[in-house]
Regions:
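Aromatic/His-enriched, Gly/Pro-containing loop or helix-boundary segments
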Residues: 1, 62, 143
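Soluble non-transmembrane domains of integral membrane proteins
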Residues: 71-316
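Helix-loop-helix
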Residues: 1-41, 81, 178-181, 196-212, ...
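Juxtamembrane extramembrane loops of integral membrane proteins
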Residues: 12, 25-102, 106-107, 154, ...
Length: 546
């Protein structure tokens, strides 16, 4: 989770939970880059002890086959694949997704174009990377996959033995099946263990590149636990581990590259580094030649249903909020998708969803307001107690508790109902910031993409965003309604500062998120003004016994 999200979660949570209690005490009611192909690969993680290494070699170093490309077109993407590394993807354009310049999103660039690399430790103890000398077993240079699956096989030789890599494409799926075929691997592969890796991570796809980078991550799943490595400036970090490996994945804000072995791998490695401020991840799965030697590459959107279909918890890469609240996040995401199937405008869906959440939380909201108003009505008596027992904290505490008990008030009564809402708050915040369906989804007028700020125009290069201002305004009105007319200068200053801070925090957030909070706040104002019972009058509190 990026720092901005974490900061927002903490601040919103603290304010929502404790603000009613604070207001009840202080506001008494007034009653009335370019990367060369790697020739020498870093030695991979070895599951068992290997013989002493003499050298690192890459097949085809001195006598590489000429580069040959094949174009593969499905109903979902346009792929250019080369014979390098036995089928490296050189470009991968998604028909359903465009970038900020209205070009198709391409998930391959120069930095990650040497992907799907096979490597192993030879029986001589050398690290062998199968970069070159691969040839396609088909003369066709174009493959159209519109009905049924189609396959493409590349072949190379090492020490007289044949190695093949077969790739299978499907018309309506982002899955690419990969099958590795070895001829007598025990003759040239140490301990019959090899690696399949993805190098170079994924490129940024969003206009706000720095924000996109905040979501970049690389993981491998071993025994149900995620293993990752955090990128550091000027340093390559690495994590490697033995164990049943279900998948390795590299993701951005909206897209993911994942390799899922048909049989669990026996180890994994994750590397990370910063390349010109870009977090770059490399992943590698170690597999045994005695397994099925089959993998599936998923390269496409961070779609929950697509990833869940693998049944290996790959969908955990979709941000649905904190792990403890994921079931709630799943329900919210499902509701939004189902509502969109009926009303094909996510802006309208967001508004209706805000209505539903407000309706669901109405009993808790009423209880919070009632508790806050009751505490505000008690504030004059509380102040008298503080003045009377200012030199005796214990008597002051006992007197306050007696007052609360006799009046039926609870100083924390407004906090608990708000605390119960936290799981929904956290889930909504996460989902609305990174839900793939919001990407490029228009609402109306100038709001043409719910995944980015609703910039109406720019003044001197500064974006003029409308929804954050509306959200901040409704928040300010709410606080004014909660505060007493005779609030002192410090209370008013705090209110202004808090609103300014939230306006600053939300100003660069996606318009879908700001639209939700604007509508939710607006409904809260209406509810507070017309639907909440009248506040407790000052004369209704039970006076403190002398």
């Amino acid at each position: 989770m990026d720092r901005q999200s974490l900061l927002a979660f903490l601040l919103i949570g603290i304010i929502i939970v404790f603000y009613p209690w604070y207001m009840s005490l202080v506001s008494p009611v007034d009653v009335s880059t370019s990367d060369e192909y790697v020739v020498e690969q870093k030695a991979s993680f070895d599951v068992e002890e290997t013989p002493k290494r003499q050298k690192t070699q890459s097949i085809g170093n001195n006598n590489s086959s000429p580069l040959q490309t094949i174009n593969v077109k499905t109903n979902l993407y346009d792929l250019t694949i080369s014979n390098k590394s036995g089928g490296s993807l050189m470009s991968y354009s998604l028909y359903s997704f465009s970038d900020h310049s209205d070009k198709l999103v391409n998930l391959i660039d120069e930095l990650n174009s040497n992907n799907l690399l096979l490597s192993f430790i030879s029986v001589d103890g050398d690290k062998v990377s199968l970069n070159h000398n691969w040839s396609p077993l088909s003369s066709s240079r174009t493959i159209s996959v519109d009905k049924g699956q189609k396959s493409l096989t590349y072949s190379t030789r090492y020490q007289g033995q044949t190695i093949e890599k077969k790739l299978t494409f499907y018309p309506d799926s982002y899955n690419i099946d990969i099958e590795v075929l070895f001829n007598q691997p025990s003759k040239f592969i140490s301990r019959n263990q090899y690696n399949l890796g993805w190098s170079g991570g994924l490129p940024p796809t969003e206009k706000n590149i720095s924000n996109d980078y905040q979501f970049f991550e690389g993981f491998a799943s071993l025994g149900g636990e995620h293993m990752g490595a955090k990128p550091k400036k000027g340093k390559l970090t690495e994590e490697s581990q033995k164990g049943s490996t279900l998948w390795s994945a590299i993701k951005t804000k909206y897209f993911i590259s994942a390799i899922v072995p048909n049989d669990p791998g026996i180890a994994a490695r994750v590397e990370s580094e910063l390349v010109d401020k870009r977090p770059v991840y490399n992943t590698e799965i170690t597999q045994s030649t005695s397994s099925s030697n089959s993998f599936t590459l998923y390269l496409g959107p961070l779609d929950y249903d697509n990833l869940k279909a693998f049944d290996v918890d790959l969908e955990s890469n979709v941000d649905l909020g904190w792990a403890l609240f994921r079931p709630i996040g799943q329900l919210i995401s499902w509701m939004l998708t189902k509502m969109y199937a009926i009303i094909p405008n996510y802006g309208v869906v967001v508004i209706l969803f805000a209505f539903l959440i407000k309706l669901l939380l109405n009993p808790l909201t009423v209880k919070t307001f009632e508790s806050t108003r009751k505490m505000q009505a008690l504030a004059p008596e509380i102040n008298k107690i503080k003045e009377k027992y200012k030199n005796d904290p214990q008597k002051m505490s006992r007197a306050q508790m007696e007052l609360y008990k006799s009046s039926g008030a609870n100083p924390m009564g407004g906090c608990l109902p708000m605390l119960i809402q936290m799981p929904i708050l956290v889930s909504v915040f996460s989902i609305f910031r990174s839900k793939i369906e919001f990407r490029g989804a228009p609402f109306f007028g100038w709001i043409d993409d719910l995944s980015v700020p609703d910039t109406l125009t720019e003044l001197g290069g500064f974006p003029i965003n409308i929804l954050p201002v509306l959200m901040g305004s409704t928040m300010f009105i709410q606080q004014k309604m909660m505060a007493a007319p005779n609030a002192d200068a410090n209370q008013k200053t705090m209110m202004y500062v808090m609103n300014a801070f939230f306006l600053f925090l939300f100003y660069s957030f996606p318009s879908g998120l700001n639209l939700y909070y604007f509508v939710f706040n607006l409904l809260s104002i209406i509810q507070q003004k017309y639907m909440i019972p009248n506040p407790v009058e000052a004369g209704s509190v039970v006076p403190l016994k002398k």
